[in-house]
UniProtKB/Swiss-Prot annotation:
Keywords: Cytoplasm, Isomerase, Manganese, Metal-binding. InterPro entries: Alkaline_phosphatase_core_sf, DeoB, Metalloenzyme, Phosphopentomutase_DeoB_cap_sf. Mn(2+) 1 binds at D13, D329, H330. This is Phosphopentomutase. The lineage of its organism: Bacteria, Bacillati, Bacillota, Clostridia, Eubacteriales. It comes from Clostridium perfringens (strain 13 / Type A). Belongs to the phosphopentomutase family. One of its GO terms (cellular component) is cytosol. Pathway: Carbohydrate degradation; 2-deoxy-D-ribose 1-phosphate degradation; D-glyceraldehyde 3-phosphate and acetaldehyde from 2-deoxy-alpha-D-ribose 1-phosphate: step 1/2. Coiled coil: none annotated.
């Protein structure tokens, strides 16, 4: 008999809580996503995260620690090499990434790859550099609309991103080109973690807006994860946001795309009204995409306050035999130089209405603590070659 019938894990994408011990190896010095956001604003009101003990883990301006937080808290460390979305999420479900995914941040993509992409898609390519999505649209959006060329760019992550204006380039055409790019980049020397379709609207510089029709074409996980174990043993695995894309559909029984992080929380609240047995895995991407990468601490703080209101509704809806875990996949300090992710600890906040105790757990050495705890709860073995130790027996 499972201790919890339903487990909900909500990933606040990029909500790091302070530099990891090895962060300087990643070029990240004194980074602190949550701490620096709080220092950048005049007021910061997150009463539900506060009640769950987030300020007990980490000093946060305007948010005091609480004497008796609900549930259990820990600062989780990342065992894998990297600080990107796929590494973080794959590790949560048990995989240990020891070789970083290929990046083309400094060089752009090889000409041979671009030539093949042009030949297969029929579109010339412009861009081919590391850039922020909004800047590259201002630079090349008008050119694309006039010529039909493809805007290809990358970032510090292992990604090849293709932009297409929805009305002139066409959404289906953009997806077709991305599928070809995914096929081409399965070669070892070009193997990026994700191809991302970046559709946008608008006709001139300063007015371009990316739409919610983004699609990620990820590599399949290189091994079995906790999600596969759950699905193969007839448990529900319901995803919200970009989770299905991150795992290329592996181990997911139902995928729900979100238009925004607020929408993702609304979807989660609807799923909570359903009767199911298994796991609901939620990713809220706006924190990272709209505020972290764009180095906007004010926007990030406001998004967290909106999230906290919906978190209150989630807490109210939890059944006695539900478990809620709030976490993140990496940091993205909006006050730090550049536009890239930051290597940080992430929160592990676990709560069920059936808990009698509360308190801080020792720092787990891996994000896979989450996957191991889920597997343990449902009486499943961790897949061969995975990492992670369950803390289920500590959640009392």
């Amino acid at each position: 008999m499972s201790k919890y019938k339903r487990i909900f894990t909500i990933v606040i994408d990029s909500l790091g809580i302070g530099a990891m011990n090895d962060s300087e190896k990643y070029g990240d010095v004194n980074v602190d996503t949550l701490g620096h956001i709080a220092e950048s604003v005049d007021t910061f009101n997150i009463p539900n995260l506060q009640k769950m003990g987030i300020a007990n883990l980490h000093p946060i301006k305007h948010v005091a620690p609480v004497e008796n937080p609900i549930g259990y808290q820990a600062k989780m460390a990342e065992a894998s090499v990297g600080k990107d979305t796929m590494t973080g999420h794959w590790e949560m479900m048990g995989l240990h990434i020891t070789k970083p995914f290929k990046t083309f941040t400094d060089t752009g993509f090889p000409q041979e790859l671009l030539d093949e992409l042009t030949e297969r898609t029929g579109h010339k390519i412009v861009g081919n550099k590391s850039a922020s999505g909004t800047e590259i649209l201002d630079e090349l959006g008008e050119h694309q609309i006039a010529t039909g060329d493809m805007i290809v760019y990358t970032s510090a992550d292992s990604v090849l991103q293709i932009c297409g204006q929805e009305e002139t380039f066409g959404l289906e055409e953009l997806y077709r080109c991305c599928e070809i790019a995914r096929e081409l980049t399965l070669k070892d020397e070009w193997k990026v973690g994700r191809i991302i379709a970046r559709p946008y609207l608008g006709t001139k510089k300063g007015e371009f807006k990316r739409t919610s029709n983004r699609h990620d074409y990820a590599l399949k996980p290189y091994g079995r994860t906790v999600l596969n174990e759950l699905k193969d043993n007839n448990f529900d695995v319901i995803s919200v946001g970009k989770i299905k894309d991150i795992f290329d559909g592996e181990g997911i029984t139902e995928g729900n795309k979100s238009k925004s992080s607020v929408h993702g929380m609304e979807q989660t609240l609807e799923i909570m009204d359903r009767d199911f047995t298994g796991f609901c895995f939620v990713n809220l991407v706006d924190f990272d995409a709209l505020w972290g990468h764009r180095r906007n601490p004010q926007g990030y703080a406001e998004e967290l306050e909106k999230f906290d209101v919906n978190l209150g509704k989630v807490l109210e809806k939890l059944h006695e035999d539900d478990l809620l875990i709030i976490t993140a996949d990496h940091g993205n300090d909006p006050t730090y130089t550049g536009t890239d992710h930051t290597r940080e600890y992430v929160p592990f906040l676990a709560y069920s209405p059936s808990m009698k105790g509360h308190g801080q757990l020792e720092t787990p050495k891996t994000f896979a603590t989450i996957g191991a705890t889920i597997a343990d709860n449902f009486g499943l073995k961790m897949p061969e070659g995975t990492i992670g130790e369950s803390v289920l027996n500590k959640l009392v």
